[in-house]
Regions:
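N-terminal subdomain of nucleotide-sugar transferases
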Residues: 54-112, 116
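Active-site proximal beta-strand in glycosyltransferases
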Residues: 162-180
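Short N-terminal targeting/anchoring amphipathic segment
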Residues: 135-153, 169
């Protein structure tokens, strides 16, 4: 309900720590009763003190990692607004969402707003490289949602190596080479065509490497 809240637990503050005397002794007497009563509810829980980072995410159907070059600023540009809506949609389906910005920057209130909505945001100084995070945690995710082909270039190989089971979804935002080609034609500048072909080849390579590609219009869909 309040993802940004902090919970403090003071061990032994109420009844001490001696389980053989006083009110505390009922803890051991009632332990087997408690286990029997809640056995069905706890059946899917992991072992105590193992994988706490995963066990804390109960009541979800899976985990999705979003990767973009930076944290979306929904009041600054259309792409960021779309990114927020896409994250909300995935959350509404029952998935836990983690957001990994390529620059690992904390963007103040924008990062805070994401966290308040229940998104786990990965930033420095807790992580110092995108690759090290993927090496240690990519296997935790059922799917990875990457925005922009140049972000995919920096991440897909690491995801395939450390999370072969994860489906990779590429949202290229728009096809950069098409936009550049239209600009070159409008400016009557054929000298830019070689660079545009290079961008096209890179984009198509990343689209082929992904399991699913999202596009926003029919022209890009036809490509």
């Amino acid at each position: 309900v309040v993802p940004s809240s902090i919970v403090y637990h003071f061990e032994g503050m109420t009844s001490g720590t001696d389980i053989t005397a006083g009110f505390k002794r009922h803890q051991e007497i009632n332990r087997p009763k408690f286990k029997r009563k809640w056995a069905r509810a706890f059946a899917s829980f992991g072992k105590e003190a193992q994988n706490p980072d995963l066990e804390k995410d109960r009541g979800i159907i899976g985990r999705v990692l979003f990767i973009d070059y930076t944290t979306p600023r929904h009041d600054r540009d259309a792409g960021s607004y779309a990114a927020h809506r896409e994250i909300e949609l995935v959350q509404s389906l029952g998935y836990k969402v983690t957001f990994l910005p390529q620059n690992l920057a904390h963007f103040g209130s924008y990062t805070d707003d994401l966290e308040r909505s229940g998104v786990e945001v990965i930033t420095a100084p807790f992580w110092l490289s995108l690759q090290s995070y993927l090496e240690q945690h990519a296997a935790d995710f059922d799917a990875v949602y990457i925005t922009r082909y140049y972000v995919a270039q920096d991440t897909i190989k690491h995801i395939r190596a450390h999370a072969p089971q994860a489906k990779i979804i590429l949202n290229n935002a728009d096809l950069h080479f098409l936009r550049q080609l239209r600009s070159a034609i409008s400016d009557k500048d054929p000298a830019r065509l070689a660079a545009i072909r290079s961008v096209r080849d890179q984009e198509l390579e990343m689209m082929t490497a992904a399991d699913l590609v999202l596009s926003y219009n029919e022209a890009e869909h036809s490509v």
